[in-house]
Amino acid sequence: MNNVRPKLSMLTEEQIQEIHDHTMNVLETVGVRVDSPSALEMLKKKVGASMVNDRLVKIPRELVEWAIKSAPKQVQVYDRRGKPQFTVGGPEDRIRFGIGVTALYYQEPDTDTPVLFERKHMRDMVRVGNKLPHYDMVSTVGIVRDVPEHLTDMYGSLEHFVNGVKPLVLLVSDEHKFNDVMEMFETLHGDLGEKPFIIPYFNPVSPLVMNEGTVDKMKIAIERGLPVIVSNYSMSGA
């Protein structure tokens, strides 16, 4: 019984293909607003100037299909010490769980009193997450608020990095600090892409907007060979 793994299937292959076809139609006929100048220039070269109107880019189906086929089918994720942890994609892939994410307050376990989230809370929560055997990763647990505001992401990410070895799902609140955080990790660890254990987490703006901060952070992560999570969550009425 310990080997029983439930499987939840929400859509048939035909329904998935239908959704994909409608998505391709929206991208080709409506397009996406791209706020990043560097990404906009790259897309102009790919789709042609006739498919770009100011910041609105219409993306042809064949380009999307090419991108899907070119993407790696599997990504091996490691821990900070270089030990393989799990593979994303492939026939044996399954749902993964991690602790998180980005609390502004910490509820004191002895008194239930909410207090501002501090470095010590990040340190303790990351250590707890690393001891939980059924959790595969540790996300950015909170936003530390006992340091200068412009250094929040630096201190929080440092505590996240040094207090655990599990794969790290990273959320950096200040888009201008993301590259600084990556450079800090490289100083501490070296090449981040050789055996990736950091998975940056991004939220573009719904619907059909690729905002500058998100796109530029994605570019920084991808150029380092890191897998990313793009959580383009749905919005009522969008």
Question: How would you name each of these model-derived features?
Answer:
Residues M1-K120:
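Acidic/polar, glycine-rich intrinsically disordered N-terminal extensions of enzymes
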Residues P114-A238:
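Helix-rich catalytic cores of soluble enzyme domains
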